[in-house]
């Protein structure tokens, strides 16, 4: 119960910071896990796609490394790798350029969860540093999220995972389990409400001739003359205009470049929850097999000596 209240308190604090940031700073469409948490009961759609792809439209690679097999009730590492060029900068919410952030969601089998601090080995703690992981929600301790965090120092994220013990955890078995990961680098192109961020390409809403372009503090106002009148398209600062006054455009034609340098990727892997009794039997079998081969060799040599001795007579 105490852990539950602690978890809820953490979520309230995060939500409070997000509200304050939304009021006093421009919405940045970063890798805030709370966006997915507030809009989706599960981070994975029925199609298998992770919902983060709804906001991060570009596809980028991601990799995950886990042990081939783990023993019950043990702590192991799940290493998520998010490769990208650290020299590249992204468009921030205010239109300026800045470093990329990263975020990730790790979907574990039921029963697997974030390892408690007192169970994490010191060597693993040094790899985790001060990173903060949290469950996707109170009902899904097996789904972990992190981000946004600075990407230049966190292109590899080590998740400390505690495996279940089938002897104590009902519904878990000594079998092979799937693990899924989704990770992004950089800001998203779409907000959860469907509106665009300033980290994507903008298109002309109508066909016509551009009669005026006014640059304001936070946006461009582009006047397009049509046969039915003038339509003004608003483009936030960030993407660069690729049209000029006097140009003719058609509906859907790009009027800016695509400033996005990031993207999202997902990957699946597997881990075996190994029964320690099977390992003991396997070791015993290997020992017996080895001893059997040794005895066979000794018996063969003994037989050869007897044969040689008989031949001498």
Curated annotation (Swiss-Prot):
Q: Offer a single GO CC term for the protein.
A: chloroplast thylakoid membrane
Q: Which Gene Ontology molecular-function terms are recorded?
A: electron transfer activity; heme binding; iron ion binding
The UniProt annotation places heme binding at: 32, 52, 55-56
How does this protein lie in the membrane?
Single-pass membrane protein
First and last residue of the signal peptide: 1-31
One Gene Ontology term of the biological-process aspect is:
photosynthesis
Its principal location?
plastid
Domain of life, per lineage:
Eukaryota
User: Gene3D superfamilies, alphabetically?
Assistant: 2.40.50.100, Cytochrome f large domain, Single helix bin
From the record, give the transmembrane residue ranges: 279-298
User: What note does UniProt attach to the cofactor annotation?
Assistant: Binds 1 heme group covalently.
InterPro entries, per database record: Cyt-f_TM, Cyt_f, Cyt_f_lg_dom, Cyt_f_lg_dom_sf, Rudment_hybrid_motif
Which compartment or compartments is the protein found in? Plastid, Chloroplast thylakoid membrane
PROSITE patterns tied to this protein: CYTF
Which residues, by range, are in coiled-coil regions?
Answer: none
Write out the entry's keywords from A to Z.
Chloroplast, Electron transport, Heme, Iron, Membrane, Metal-binding, Photosynthesis, Plastid, Signal, Thylakoid, Transmembrane, Transmembrane helix, Transport
- What cofactor does this chain's UniProt record say it requires? heme
Per the record, the similarity remark reads: Belongs to the cytochrome f family.
SUBUNIT field: The 4 large subunits of the cytochrome b6-f complex are cytochrome b6, subunit IV (17 kDa polypeptide, petD), cytochrome f and the Rieske protein, while the 4 small subunits are PetG, PetL, PetM and PetN. The complex functions as a dimer.
Protein's job: Component of the cytochrome b6-f complex, which mediates electron transfer between photosystem II (PSII) and photosystem I (PSI), cyclic electron flow around PSI, and state transitions.
Q: What is this protein called?
A: Cytochrome f
Species in which this protein is naturally found = Mesostigma viride
Native organism taxonomy: Eukaryota, Viridiplantae, Streptophyta, Mesostigmatophyceae, Mesostigmatales
